[in-house]
């Protein structure tokens, strides 16, 4: 494929290899970085009994048939150097014996059935027509897919013109049930409440640029980072629903506007100065009715609405450390959306609210087109080291870490079980056995990082400085930390991925002097910011940290690339 100039970096690192420098927990004098960071190691004995229990749970896991999207193969043909790359989707329902035949303008291209999900057609012409046919036991089944080769290696289209708007987020889902993804965009204008003349919107488009609908969020959200939405086929009808927080003044894709639901005569709560709060140059609305709404994916029409839980009121519940309205409103406004199979079969919407102090959560599934509440969780005991109070990130992951067939909700240093109960808050221990709960952080990864272990592991960073481990590697089922680094400063980023084939399993790294390591905690370099990278356009970055914002599988092998 022709190389684009997108910043995707081949991530096999060149560095001087070191023997393990891990030790028993050391204080901050273990390492002094030239940039002023001090670094110590935290190491705990791996609980082999719990590790064995995880393997037993994995072997005995139920084989649930989960309700998934009904997608097609996603057949595409993209021009590259000296030919066309044709690729398609492998589905979770596919049999191990399924193979394929590929045709171009009626001519079969493969000598024997294709066992992979791509084929490079040398010398193909632009706009050639390709047909993919499924093969079982050497015979074509009659199921086939057709596509026309693109004239360039991307597709683009014009969006609806909106003066002063930025596109700053997006998602994909099959909104109309044709088996192909459509595109959803979040677009925001100026969010200054004193000067704005328009409001944030969510738009849906087909990949040919056809505009499907627009939802106008209205005047009662003025902080774009708190505008989240989820798009997925929640009820199994073949079409994705769109689920998001809504307000009085929100207008759906059919032009229906939510009115004065509480009868107080107000639908724009941003007009009152006393109802506005500012914290670190961001504006927040202190009090407004909040809802959770379902929108038809094909039309954008609201089909159900319920009161949003957990409520952000009273504000005093969201911190015992602060009493100023700005901080309290910021904490109450922070929320995360996710999708989890809490019963092991059907998807539920999960909301987690709060991060730095109080953490609350709720979940719903969709039944007969209506919200059905699964549970609501309130974190009560702020003084309990085992409580998830103060232990939540800006992101969440849903995954079945205990292999009971049902998803858990993980957010950095905490986990909530499928039934809404707290599983654990991650802790570390000093040499006297005293526990320290690890706090809120900005990034984490959950994956099967060790090829010799079937359990999930978490690599996470934490904001608070001078923790015994403010970047660490822990068991995602039990929360037990195996090793980590202590810092004298906030560790704001971390990343875990398999980027180097010379080490078993994943590699881990992070910001603020986090030296890259293997999954055993052995340093694999003598620096954290002296690397050279070849970007996809062939240029080289020198004296750089390993990028840690996003990872992708880009070039067809089993190593990760880094998108930055």
Which residue stretches match the model-derived regions?
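Short, Lys/Arg-rich N-terminal segment immediately upstream of the first membrane anchor
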Residues: 1-4, 241
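Sec-dependent N-terminal signal peptides of Gram-positive bacterial secreted proteins and lipoproteins
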Residues: 4-25
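Sec-dependent signal peptide cleavage junction
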Residues: 20-38
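Beta-rich interaction/scaffold domains
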Residues: 34, 40, 96-97, 102
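Terminal, intrinsically disordered low-complexity segments enriched in charged/polar
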Residues: 36-50
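Beta-propeller-forming repeat regions
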Residues: 51-74, 81-83, 90-95, 101, ...
């Amino acid at each position: 494929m022709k190389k684009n100039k997108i910043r995707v970096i081949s991530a096999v690192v060149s560095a001087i290899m070191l023997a393990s420098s891990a030790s028993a927990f050391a204080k901050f004098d273990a390492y002094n970085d030239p940039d002023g960071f001090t670094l110590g190691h935290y190491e705990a004995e791996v609980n082999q009994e719990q590790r064995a229990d995880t393997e037993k749970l994995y072997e005995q896991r139920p084989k649930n048939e989960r309700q998934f999207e009904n997608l097609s193969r996603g057949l595409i043909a993209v021009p590259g150097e000296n030919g066309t790359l044709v690729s398609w989707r492998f589905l979770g329902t596919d049999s191990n014996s399924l193979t394929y035949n590929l045709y171009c303008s009626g001519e079969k291209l493969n000598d024997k059935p294709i066992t992979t999900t791509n084929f490079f057609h040398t010398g193909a012409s632009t706009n050639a027509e390709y047909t993919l046919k499924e093969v079982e036991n050497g015979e074509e089944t009659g199921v086939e897919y057709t596509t026309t080769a693109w004239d360039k290696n991307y597709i683009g289209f014009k969006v609806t013109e909106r003066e002063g708007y930025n596109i700053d987020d997006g998602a994909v889902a099959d909104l109309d049930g044709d088996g192909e993804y459509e595109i959803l965009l979040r677009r925001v204008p100026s969010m200054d409440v004193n000067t704005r003349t328009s409001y944030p919107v969510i738009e849906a488009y087909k990949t040919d640029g056809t505009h499907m609908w627009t939802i106008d969020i209205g005047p009662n959200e003025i902080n774009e980072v708190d505008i989240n939405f989820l798009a997925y086929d929640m009820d199994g009808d073949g079409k994705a629903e769109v689920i998001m927080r809504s307000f009085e003044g929100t207008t759906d894709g059919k032009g229906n506007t939510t009115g004065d639901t509480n009868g107080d005569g107000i639908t724009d709560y941003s007009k009152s100065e006393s109802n506005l709060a500012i914290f670190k140059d961001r504006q927040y609305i202190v009090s407004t009715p909040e809802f959770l709404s379902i929108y038809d994916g094909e039309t954008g029409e609201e089909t159900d609405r319920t009161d949003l839980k957990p409520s952000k009121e009273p504000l005093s519940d969201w911190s015992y450390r602060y009493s100023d309205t700005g901080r309290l409103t910021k904490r109450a406004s922070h929320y995360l959306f996710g999708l989890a199979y809490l019963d092991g079969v059907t998807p539920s919407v999960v909301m987690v609210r709060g991060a730095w102090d109080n953490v609350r959560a709720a979940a719903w599934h969709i039944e007969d087109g209506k919200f059905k509440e699964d549970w609501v969780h309130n974190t009560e005991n702020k003084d309990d080291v085992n409580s998830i109070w103060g232990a939540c990130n800006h992101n969440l992951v849903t995954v079945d870490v205990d292999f009971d067939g049902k998803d858990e909700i993980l957010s950095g240093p905490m986990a909530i079980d499928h039934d809404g109960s707290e599983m654990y808050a991650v802790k570390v221990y000093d040499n006297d056995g005293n526990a320290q709960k690890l706090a809120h952080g900005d990034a984490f990864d959950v994956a099967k990082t060790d090829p010799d272990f079937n359990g999930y592991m978490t690599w996470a960073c934490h904001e608070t400085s001078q923790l015994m481990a403010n970047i660490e590697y822990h068991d995602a089922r039990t929360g037990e930390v195996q090793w980590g680094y202590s810092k004298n400063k906030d560790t704001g980023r971390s990343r875990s991925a398999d980027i180097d084939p010379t080490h078993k399993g994943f590699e881990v790294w992070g910001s603020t002097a986090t030296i890259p390591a293997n999954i055993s905690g052995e340093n694999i370099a003598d620096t954290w910011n002296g690397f050279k990278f070849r970007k996809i356009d062939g240029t080289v970055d020198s004296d750089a940290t390993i990028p840690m914002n996003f990872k992708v599988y880009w070039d067809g092998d089993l190593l990760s690339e880094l998108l930055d």
